[in-house]
């Protein structure tokens, strides 16, 4: 094969295959072939063959080219650099460029994870104590704080600003503190309602007294409130405070409010100086700030100065919105110079800029204000033609509302409906998707005109579009129904308002319920009010007052009694005047004791079924204490500071409507009792104790208040075996005392895993905690029960019941079927010994889990724990409170009278059986 033939073959191979060949390898092969006579063309090698026949052994050439020996004087070819291997991933350069742009966009949208979060292994950075505190970011508006924000916003939308303010203010003292966004929402709502003094007071409360860090929006709102109230100097003080102390600079909105206030106060020179200061601080030229100054100079008649500022704005403003042209148009219309006004309008249209809804709305209002309806309709139609969402938004609900209101003002109701549904005439224009504000406006307008048929049609259309429910439209419909004497429809609309969780404000609710009761809708009013009480926030006390008085005047005493019970249960509170009225009415009917029993009862907050046991009870919706509510003694430590309560310890995880073991009742001197809910179970009284005897420490209540609790075995509680524990239901503000322990002391209670050991800590080998052998003054009498009344004690078998009755002072308290004189030693136990309570089987939980507090322990008192509960059993610790002056449980030195080890083991085996 010749060299040229081989080169052609190699060239063909390299052009038809995608895998490239190494240039150095190709040169080496060509070099070997050129020196090998075996590969030469036969026609050109005839002479060489003859020489080889003549000299057969002359430089023999092997057949394998790889074994060919290159002469020493031969110079090897220069090696070329290797070509890197690259696959052709794109068909064109444009496709490759598009891929690069896509990757860059993705990096901008999705930054790498290491840029989003800090390395978890790295220690947290230390905060500079001298660094200024920064306001909350939007990432703080999550979880419970977001729920609080939504609740406040719902109250604001319902126009119940007092309830929203109360909720936000009282949340400062809870674990869920409001964010700066929640504070700004209620402050802005007060400003919009022209309640400037309350807005300023809320700012002082949140950001100065409650130590919440304000942001620039907070300062802008308080500056705006000061300016509208006429206190421009106070607004300037806030502005100087921002410059001196805030970790951010004032925004353009800050200068808008300040220049507006200064111009309204007649200090236009100070406003101009503030504009120069804004520009010197690097702020961009703002058309609204310039418009405030131009409006001020036009009002003063200084047209040249206004034009000067307008020219300055056009030279500095990069994006002009056309609002200043509307100011000049209004000025010329007021002067009666319509020609100049329209010339200013045409100059604005000649700019061919995209008109946004705020600018178009201002121009529409100017045209309609001065009777230029043709120009207004032409501008409205042009805005509809240019509306092509999502890229171009030329119309909003305010735009349509302006023209609809003009139609109602002129009495053209059919034209109002057509305007409401009007669409642009251009091919590219799209219909405006009306929001709930637009539907609320047209429904309100029809209700004002008494056109309930059209109002109902648009109201139903808004509901069918799944728009968010709004309180103003519901209130307008209810008022229209009452005005038209359609009482049943008014009741249905009020019921729907409650169903969609809209707030019924105090003034509106009192007026509507009064009208319903006046028209004989007593039962319906009570039903709607009951449904309102099941939701948060609770109805205002004034609404309850109107309904209760109406029911009493209508001789519906049973329903009035139920409503009063709901007021007590919801912690709404009964005023003194209403209380006297109710008692007087029921006394005339001979039912005074019945209503007094309800009025003197005290509701206890019930934890929701979804809450865990290690969280404090839910704060009622309406704060404050009921007059009959018992107060917590001051010397008790609150239970909320303890972290040892488990979710299955029976803290009232009941179903809806269940009360956790009863409620506080003032039983005219009766002592509290533990009452069993079963019919065949007897009550065990904690009363009738002789002088010198000390009641259990957990039952100490304030004078005049007793606690009636029950061993109620209700379904839905969190005990493992269905045995419910019913020792909660405290009123708002009451907390379970856990024994005034000094720091460092902790009591480990029940619900420990089998691997955990419960032991009587820090006792000497000779010390034993005695439940018996107490002096006559130190014994606890277990209720002087009649003979035969036995207390079933935690799943005992038949015949294994303990009688706690009829004990004399010299008798001892038998624990777990002990005979008189037997003592139960709780100390000196080895690790393998285990205490059991009253014949429990594996997996059962004793009903005696009313964990009594350790009374008044001091720093020298030891920590109490039980020893090694049997696997599957939940240890039933009953800390004793048989304390006298020393407030310590009895201890006894080791002696012959103690229980021996064999007796103890026999007792344990017997209890297991």
From Swiss-Prot:
Pro residues bias spans: 74-84
InterPro entries reported for this sequence: Pentatricopeptide_rpt, PPR_domain-containing, TPR-like_helical_dom_sf, TPR_rpt
UniProt PPR repeat ranges: 179-214, 215-250, 251-285, 286-316, 321-355, 356-390, 396-426, 435-469, 470-504, 505-539, 540-574
Keywords recorded for this protein, A-Z: Nucleus, Repeat, Transcription, Transcription regulation
Stretch list, region 14 X 11 AA approximate tandem repeats of W-x(2)-Q-x(4)-Q-x(2): 674-858
Chain positions of motif Nuclear localization signal: 99-108
Protein's cellular compartments: Nucleus
Role according to the record: May function as a transcriptional regulator essential for early embryogenesis.
Protein family membership: Belongs to the PPR family. P subfamily.
Domain comment, as recorded: The WQQ domain consists of a repetition of W-x(2)-Q-x(4)-Q-x(2) motifs.
Name of the protein: Pentatricopeptide repeat-containing protein At1g10270
